[in-house]
A protein has these predicted regions:
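C-terminal lobe and adjacent flexible extensions of AdoMet/dcAdoMet transferase-like proteins
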Residues: 209, 228-287
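Catalytic cores of RNA-modifying enzymes
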Residues: 1-225, 229, 260, 271, ...
Length: 287
């Protein structure tokens, strides 16, 4: 039975092991059972699932995952948390493996092949806010076989992931997320649901992976280089933004001609284009 998820039990475990929070790991442990249940429900965990948990901490959410999933692999970077997980909070579960590693250095494709025969898995995480984007983009770009990713992130980041063209939150992250997945904000989470309290509000967002991207492009890496260049200097026109990006090696004439072919103004900005329009522009400009 899950025993964590409230302040009292969390404090007891931390005191028992003299655990000190490491600021460099961005540690904020969940202490609200309603939020934990909401995450499990949003992730649609079943007894068929292998779940990868990134940053289990003291095992608060891991206990819930173990009770709902077939198997859980929990990857934790902080070696001081491993004894708590293995000897205490997860000792009662036989369907969990704890790996002391940096998720960004782990070969997840090999791990999924070995543990799940290459079949699609689910990812659940209460992510350190300073490293949210590299972790999510790493999962997308390495093409790990995934059904969905359900993560606790900074509210502002969740809004950016879900944003559409023309909004202030719309940018390169929004487009990358929509290329790979369908985002859904399942819950907003206040600061008092964590220990220690973060300085900002949080949100649970589920990213349901597309079986195939919604747009077809000649060169995926060129598409994302184009998108990044379009938002590097938000207030510049697309023509100026793209011709200033050395990695693209595009002339003003090339960009203007492509935009004209698409029926777009030479003064249009990146924030006005949909994913479909970026894909079309990428295909016109890819060499």
């Amino acid at each position: 039975m899950a025993t964590l998820g409230n302040p009292q039990n969390t404090i007891e475990i931390l005191k028992k092991y003299d655990f000190m929070f490491q600021k460099r790991f961005g540690q904020n442990f969940l202490i609200d059972t309603h939020v934990l249940e909401k995450i499990i429900k949003s992730a649609e965990i079943t007894k068929e699932d292998l779940v990868l948990e990134i940053g289990p901490g003291i095992g608060t959410m891991t206990q819930y995952l173990c009770e709902n999933a077939r198997e859980v692999i929990a990857v934790e970077i902080d070696k001081n948390l491993i004894p708590i997980l293995e000897k205490d909070t997860l000792a009662q579960y036989d369907n969990v493996t704890v790996i002391n590693e940096d998720i960004l250095k782990l070969d997840l494709n090999a791990l999924v092949q070995e543990r799940n025969g290459g079949k699609r898995i689910k990812v659940v995480a209460n992510l350190p806010y300073y490293i949210t984007t590299p972790i999510i983009m790493g999962l997308f770009e390495s093409h790990v076989p995934l059904k969905n990713i359900t993560v606790m992130v900074q509210k502002e980041v969740a809004d950016r992931m879900q944003a559409g063209p023309g909004s202030k939150d719309y940018g390169a992250l929004s487009l990358a997320v929509h290329y790979y997945a369908t985002p859904y904000i399942a819950a907003n989470v206040p600061q008092n649901c964590f220990m220690p309290r973060p300085n900002v509000g949080s949100a649970v967002i589920r990213l349901t992976l597309h079986e195939e991207p919604p747009v077809k492009v000649k060169d995926e890496s060129f598409l994302f280089a184009l998108i990044r260049a379009s938002f590097n200097q938000r207030r510049k026109t697309l023509v100026n933004g793209l011709t200033n990006a050395a990695e693209l090696a595009l002339s003003k004439e090339e960009v203007q001609t492509a935009l004209e072919e698409m029926g777009l103004s030479a003064t249009v900005r990146g924030e006005a284009l949909t994913l479909e329009q970026f894909a079309e522009l990428s295909n016109l400009l890819a060499k």
